[in-house]
């Protein structure tokens, strides 16, 4: 059992990239770092004001994940003080809940000496999230493509792609449950085939570093964009502006409400500045894909 303090660093993520709905994730260069030290009772201290509304006791998602992960293996963990530093916008489509879950799994693994395999961690995180896209990328880094059911899990990983990323963050957060409530219960067989083809071609294009084709396919999503785009002010205008400045493609980041824009490498700062000026009610953040996933430092 771990007694001395340690830290866990986990990247932000974006999910779907359009038609890769619920199975494609990409780690991003924004990060959450959690320092864990023994304490008499569980206490979470957030250093970022945006997280001030979150619970700081055992009801916190990170603590719940730690306890549930340990309990799966009939282990209990001693209380900790968790000091959290994060530059990941909360509830804005950048996998903040998946980051918390990934961190909790890693902390439980360390505190209870569970010696979990990568697949163990991926299965636990995906079960807790209900889908595999964000949490696999948070745990492994790079880009992940997952097949996940109650009985089976398969994950392929790709290195972080050589692109720049711009995230357009709106001023209002959107709960994932609300966003999922906008989706239809069914698609026709013909629609499903079209969506699957777009996702397959996009993934193949990314694997071949063909981001021109990948960007086009990002914008061919039929699974969620048509139903969720109504919640984004100036959605079509932003997409047109992205094309004007040479972006590969633009789509909704995860369940929203942020937008993910793939751009040629080393242009993300310039594109972010242009979009920030043109759409001031959004915050344009320049970043890159992240190679590394969750990491423990002693």
Where are these regions (language model features)?
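ATP-binding N-lobe of GHMP and related small-molecule kinases
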Residues: 1-92, 106, 110, 114-116, ...
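Short beta-strand segments
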Residues: 9-11, 27, 138-141, 147, ...
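Glycine-rich beta-alpha junction loops
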Residues: 30, 142, 169-174, 221-222, ...
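Short beta-strand-to-loop capping motifs
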Residues: 38, 170, 261-265
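Gly/Ser-rich oxyanion-binding loop with an adjacent helix/lid
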Residues: 76-152
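Anionic-ligand binding region
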Residues: 144, 148-154, 173-204, 214
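Glycine-rich, charge-dense phosphate/pyrophosphate-binding loop(s)
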Residues: 206-298
């Amino acid at each position: 059992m771990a007694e001395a303090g340690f830290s866990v660093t986990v990247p932000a993520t974006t999910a779907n990239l359009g038609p890769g709905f619920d199975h494609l994730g990409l780690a991003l260069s924004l990060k959450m770092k959690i320092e864990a030290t023994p304490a008499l009772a569980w206490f979470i201290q957030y250093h970022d004001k945006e997280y001030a509304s979150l619970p700081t006791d055992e009801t916190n998602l990170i603590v719940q994940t730690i306890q549930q992960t340990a309990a799966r293996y009939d282990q209990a963990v001693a209380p900790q003080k968790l000091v959290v530093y994060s530059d990941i916008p909360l509830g804005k489509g950048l996998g903040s809940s998946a980051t918390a879950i990934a961190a909790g799994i890693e902390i439980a693994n360390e505190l209870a000496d569970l010696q979990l395999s990568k697949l163990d961690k991926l299965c636990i995180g995906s079960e807790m999230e209900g889908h595999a896209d964000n949490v696999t990328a948070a745990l492994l880094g790079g880009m992940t493509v997952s097949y996940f059911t109650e009985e089976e899990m398969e994950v392929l990983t790709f290195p972080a792609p050589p692109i720049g990323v711009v995230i357009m963050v709106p001023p209002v957060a959107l709960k994932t449950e609300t966003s999922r409530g906008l989706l239809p219960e069914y698609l026709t067989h013909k629609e499903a085939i079209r969506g699957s083809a777009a996702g397959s071609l996009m993934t193949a294009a990314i694997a071949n570093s063909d981001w021109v084709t990948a960007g086009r396919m990002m914008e061919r999503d039929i699974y969620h964009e048509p139903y969720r785009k109504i919640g984004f002010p100036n959605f079509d205008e932003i997409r047109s502006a992205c094309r004007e400045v040479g972006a590969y493609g633009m789509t909704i980041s995860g369940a929203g409400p942020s937008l993910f824009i793939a751009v040629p490498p080393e242009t993300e700062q310039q594109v972010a500045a242009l979009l920030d000026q043109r759409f001031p009610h959004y915050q344009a953040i320049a970043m890159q894909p992240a190679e590394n996933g969750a990491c423990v430092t002693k």
